[in-house]
């Protein structure tokens, strides 16, 4: 396994770990932290996907923009997944930096469920890029 492949695997592992963390945080009613971990699960998985395509970015906004440009706008990723990643990007910022922000438990549960589907869908794209 070369260095790039090791980094891709690392990001994929981190994505799953963050989603597992989000579930634990939800059980402990730590909704802000759960939202943060959901976002990072998506971010790490998208970072792995972009690196598999030979792209790397230092800023979260760069990762988001490249994902939308390279995968959502081209139809390689369902637009709903793109919208979900965009929403979680905003929720994470609001939750981390906003004042008097509260998240509803049912919303966080739904976001975890959607994040599982997101990670699975991106996983398939990463595997396709590895085979290409």
UniProtKB/Swiss-Prot annotation:
InterPro entries (UniProt xref): HEPN_dom (IPR007842), UPF0332_toxin (IPR052226)
PANTHER family listed in its UniProt record: UPF0332 PROTEIN TM_1000
Pfam families reported for this sequence: HEPN
Superkingdom, according to UniProt? Answer: Bacteria
Q: Which family is annotated?
A: Belongs to the UPF0332 family.
Residues that span the membrane, as ranges: none
Protein name (record): UPF0332 protein TM_1000
């Amino acid at each position: 396994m070369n260095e790039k492949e090791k980094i891709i695997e690392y990001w994929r592992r981190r994505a799953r770990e963050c989603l597992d963390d989000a579930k634990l945080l939800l059980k402990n009613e730590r909704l802000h932290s759960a939202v943060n971990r959901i976002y990072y699960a998506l971010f790490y998985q998208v970072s792995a996907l972009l690196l598999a395509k030979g792209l790397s970015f230092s800023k979260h906004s760069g990762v988001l923009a490249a994902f939308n440009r390279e995968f959502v706008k081209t139809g390689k990723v369902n637009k709903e997944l793109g919208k979900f990643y965009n929403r979680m990007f905003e929720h994470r910022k609001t939750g981390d930096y906003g004042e008097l922000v509260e998240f509803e438990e049912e919303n966080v549960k739904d976001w975890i469920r959607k994040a599982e589907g997101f990670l699975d869908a991106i996983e398939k794209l990463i595997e396709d890029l590895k085979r290409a």
